[in-house]
Swiss-Prot record:
Organism: Mus musculus (Mouse)
Enzyme class: transferase
Binding site for ATP: I45, G46, E47, G48, T49, Y50, G51, I52, V53, K68
Name of the protein in its database record: Cyclin-dependent kinase 10
Disruption phenotype: CDK10 knockout results in partial prenatal lethality. Surviving mice display severe growth retardation, a reduced volume of mineralized matrix in the head, femur, tibia and fibula, bifidity or clefting of C1 (atlas) or C2 (axis), and absence of the dens. Additional defects are present in the kidney, lung, heart, spleen, liver, and muscle. At cellular level, CDK10 knockout does not affect cell proliferation. However, knocked-out mouse embryonic fibroblasts (MEFs) develop longer cilia.
The protein's assembly and partners: Heterodimer with CCNQ, the interaction is required for kinase activity. Interacts with ETS2. Interacts with PRK2.
Length: 360
């Protein structure tokens, strides 16, 4: 058992062998972790699934980092399990297109924990809202290839992100795109264990999740990839639903009504009988993107397969002829530079809830 004396700044631990407490020396109380005092907070840049994020400077190295404060407000018994999952996953992940967890640092009285992450100057949601002109198709391909490479690495390591969206895709000044915010991520195995369907931001949520499946595979990430690709191409969200019922209806309007023929097991999903789906026999992707090449439409259709077992994998996408035809993907270092919105503005108190691109 531990006691913290806030007035004297002392931490006392109860001795097991002898009655009473002993004081932990200041030089030992943080263990191997550094103190957050060694970082200068520059400004608040956002709010992830389970914590506030700051731009900060490491006073020892002068490096600019992202400092994510772990939410502890609802916890009485230590670190939230969601944060433990995120820390555990990120510590084992090392890939150019995955945000890097550099270290974990602690607050003054050990009551707060911060994740020190690699800093990226932009997030795609802010870019899409503030860009004077949309990304070119060559730039979209450059972004998507990086997203897919990072995702292929995750899936090969048996990890599902479960919250892919444009606001969780970061970009450095050198055009390197990194997937961030692993607060909802899960490791999976065989057989696949049941998981809650209430994951993935609504606009990017796969139909099987909307219909209540608890069997989650990497295919839910791939549906979100399709939504992201379409959003980058159109410069606006593809399926901006306001409720789960509305979201399903938007999907049906775009892709047609699902059936047992194209999606075996569809009628047995937990919520399939609760929705009265409109009869819509047509796939309208081509009408939505009349200028897109046949290869581009094939890729979108592959990502938007109703049947999760038939949906494109990250490997399938990386081999797509869409990325091999003109306009070819530009090199990351040739991506345009933009004003540093994350450096200059303090993020709103509920950034995800207020952003036009980050609603439910």
């Amino acid at each position: 058992m531990a006691e913290v004396d806030l007035e004297s700044d002392q931490i006392r631990l109860k001795c097991i062998r002898k009655e009473g407490f002993f004081t932990v020396p200041p030089e030992h109380r943080l263990g191997r972790c550094r103190s957050v005092k060694e970082f200068e907070k520059l400004n608040r840049i956002g709010e992830g699934t389970y914590g506030i994020v700051y731009r900060a400077r490491d006073t020892q190295t002068d490096e600019i980092v992202a400092l994510k404060k772990v939410r502890m407000d609802k916890e009485k018994d230590g670190i939230p399990i969601s944060s433990l999952r995120e820390i555990t996953l990120l510590l084992r992940l090392r890939h150019p297109n995955i945000v890097e967890l550099k270290e974990v640092v602690v607050g003054n009285h050990l009551e707060s924990i911060f994740l020190v992450m690699g800093y990226c100057e932009q997030d795609l949601a802010s870019l899409l809202e503030n860009m004077p002109t949309p990304f070119s198709e060559a730039q979209v391909k450059c972004i998507m290839l990086q997203v897919l490479r990072g995702l292929q690495y995750l899936h090969r390591n048996f990890i599902i992100h479960r919250d892919l969206k444009v606001s969780n895709l970061l970009m450095t000044d050198k055009g390197c795109v990194k997937t961030a915010d692993f607060g909802l991520a899960r490791a999976y195995g065989v057989p696949v264990k049941p998981m809650t369907p209430k994951v993935v931001t609504l606009w990017y949520r796969a139909p099987e999740l909307l219909l209540g499946t608890t069997t989650q595979t990497t295919s839910i990430d791939m549906w979100a990839v399709g939504c992201i690709l379409a959003e980058l191409l159109a410069h606006k969200p593809l399926l901006p639903g306001t409720s789960e019922i509305h979201q399903i209806d938007l999907i049906v309007q775009l892709l047609g009504t699902p059936s047992e023929n194209i999606w075996p097991g569809f009628s047995k999903l937990p919520l399939a009988g609760q929705y009265s789906l409109r009869k819509q026999p047509y796939n309208n992707l081509k009408h939505k993107f009349p200028w897109l090449s046949e290869a581009g439409l094939r890729l979108l259709n592959f990502l938007f397969m109703y049947d999760p077992k038939k949906r494109a994998t990250s490997g399938d996408c990386l081999e797509s002829s869409y990325f091999k035809e003109k306009p070819l993907p530009c090199e990351p270092e040739l991506m345009p530079t933009f004003p540093h919105h994350r450096n200059k503005r303090a993020a709103p108190a509920a950034a995800e809830g207020q952003s036009k691109r980050c609603r439910p």
